C-alpha cells in the first residue's frame, strides 16, 4: 500500500530556533493531491487546526520535497485578531441578510480563495485544471478589495478591484479606474498604484468571505486604521456613476442604454411639442368661444332691431326686411 505524507512546520525568519512540526497528513493509495502553491508564487493563506495550537490561520512560506513521497509545508502564523467577517456582524446585530448592512457602492474586502497546484507523487507539480471543484486559472482569487453591487439573503454581489492595470482597459467600458478619493486612507490600497474595478467579473459571494476594509477612523482622536463594522467607506459620486456604466457594459447593455437615452430625448421633445400645441389649442378654443358669444349677441341685437324696424317701415314680414338689407349689402 503506497503511502505519501504532507508535513507542516513552523517558520519564523526572525527566529533561529529549530522549526516545530505542527502536524502530518498521510494519504494511502492516492496518486496526487492539491497543495497550497500557485504558478505566480503569490502569497497563499490556509486555515488549518493543529492539535494544541490556538492559531488556525496560516501563511504558506514555502513548500519543499523532503524525500520520496514526503513533502514539507512551512507556515507562519497570521494575526486575525482584528478580522471580523460580515457574517459575524450580522449575527451580533440579529440581521437576517447582508443587505441590512452593506449597500451599493460600499468598499469591502473579500476572501476569494486561492488557486492551488497539483502534486503528483510520481510526476511532480502541475496545474489543477482537472480539478474543476476548486478555483481555476483566470478566476478571481486571493484576498482583495471589492465593491458591493447588491445584497440579499442569497449573498452579496461584488465587483472585484485589482491594482494590476488590465490590458485594453482604456477601450473596455466594463473596467474603470477608481478616483483616489474612493481609496484614500484604506490600508489595502497602495498610494502609488492605481486601482481598477472589473465589472465584467461580478460575482456573488457569501457574507462569510467579506470583512470591512482597514480604514483610518477620521472620527476618533487617534485616527488609527481599524475595521469598521458599519462599512462606511463608499465610492465617490463619480465612481458610482462609473460603476453603473461598467455594469451595463459588462452585460452588453451599454449600447441599449445609449439608444434608450436617445429615445427618451425624442420622447421629451415630442412631449414639449405636444404641450405647445395644447397651449395653442387652448388659446384658439378660448378665442373661438369669445367669437361665438359675440356672434350670438349680435344675432339677438339684429333680431330686436328687425322687429322694431318692421313696425315702422311699412314692411309686412321679416323676409322683406332681409331682402331690403341684402340690396344694401
Set out the residue ranges of the language-model regions:
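Short, acidic Gly/Pro/Ser/Thr-rich loop/turn segments
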Residues: 117, 165, 204-207
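Active-site substrate-binding loop(s) of clan PA
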Residues: 90-92, 122-123, 135-137
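A mature extracytoplasmic/lumenal domain signature
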Residues: 114, 160-162, 203
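C-terminal terminal-subdomain/extension
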Residues: 1-104, 173-329
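A short secondary-structure junction signal
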Residues: 119-122, 158-160, 169-171, 209-212
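Short coil-to-beta transition motif at edge beta-strands of beta-rich domains
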Residues: 3-4, 33-35, 99-132
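Compact nucleic-acid interaction/catalytic patches
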Residues: 132-143, 148-185
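Residues in well-ordered beta-strands of folded domains
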Residues: 109, 159, 198-200
